[in-house]
């Protein structure tokens, strides 16, 4: 894959408006989206057209290298911008087992910087640690409290605990009755309401 450019994003935003698609939020993910030098401009373009923007980041050096641009965007768009920081576990050793050694403290430093500057914050965690959701949320709550991070660990929109996917396991089919039992409408789940844009190397867009 290759990085999207500001021109790429502008064309897709034009298409959204031209087709009157019911889009309210533009999300940027990766890899690490802050590795893309065009990200601040793409954020400004998206927010300037009235969309909310969500960045999924590890909050490490690439993000901190763009502090000035982030503060400028925040000053103009405030609550319309959310940064969701990936913290794979509330325990440093487990987080580093996935992210690599010496990744915990840089992430915490980035998270604190975002909190200190009153950015709209969320956290994404994983559920691969053989602990209950309640235990995980209590662990993250303790982490947030210890670092002065104003995130409600009981709010599933602010602390998103993603289920694990095992490519080796068969996945049961979902029937209409399953949706009724769960009290969920199929049209409300993410894959029914979200679309991803990716750019292949060598492609125009």
Give the location of each predicted region.
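Canonical radical SAM enzyme core domain
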Residues: 1-14, 31-77, 83, 87-109, ...
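Conserved hydrophobic residues forming the short capping helix/wall of the S-adenosyl-L-methionine
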Residues: 16, 72-74, 144, 148
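Short helix-loop-beta connector
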Residues: 20-24
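Structural preference for beta-strand elements that scaffold enzyme active sites
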Residues: 25-27, 52-54, 80-84, 120-122, ...
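Radical SAM enzyme [4Fe-4S]-AdoMet core and its adjacent flexible, acidic
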Residues: 88, 92-204
């Amino acid at each position: 894959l290759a990085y999207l450019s500001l021109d790429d994003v502008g064309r897709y935003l034009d298409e959204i408006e031209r087709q009157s698609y019911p889009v309210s939020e533009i999300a940027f993910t990766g890899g690490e989206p802050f590795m893309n030098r065009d990200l601040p401009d793409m954020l400004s373009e998206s927010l300037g057209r009235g969309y909310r923007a969500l960045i999924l980041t590890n909050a490490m050096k690439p993000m901190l290298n763009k502090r000035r641009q982030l503060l400028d965007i925040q000053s103009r768009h405030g609550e319309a911008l959310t940064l969701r920081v990936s913290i794979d576990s509330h325990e440093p050793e487990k987080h580093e087992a996935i992210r690599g050694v010496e990744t915990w403290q840089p992430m915490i430093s980035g998270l604190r910087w975002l909190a200190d500057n009153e950015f709209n914050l969320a956290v994404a965690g994983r559920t691969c640690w053989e602990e209950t959701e309640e235990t995980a949320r209590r662990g993250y709550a303790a982490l947030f409290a210890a670092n002065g991070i104003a995130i409600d660990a009981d709010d599933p929109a602010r602390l998103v605990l993603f289920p694990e996917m095992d490519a080796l396991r068969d996945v049961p089919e979902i029937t209409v009755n399953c949706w009724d039992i769960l009290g969920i409408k199929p049209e409300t789940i993410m894959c029914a309401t979200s679309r991803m844009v990716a750019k292949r190397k060598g492609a125009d867009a």
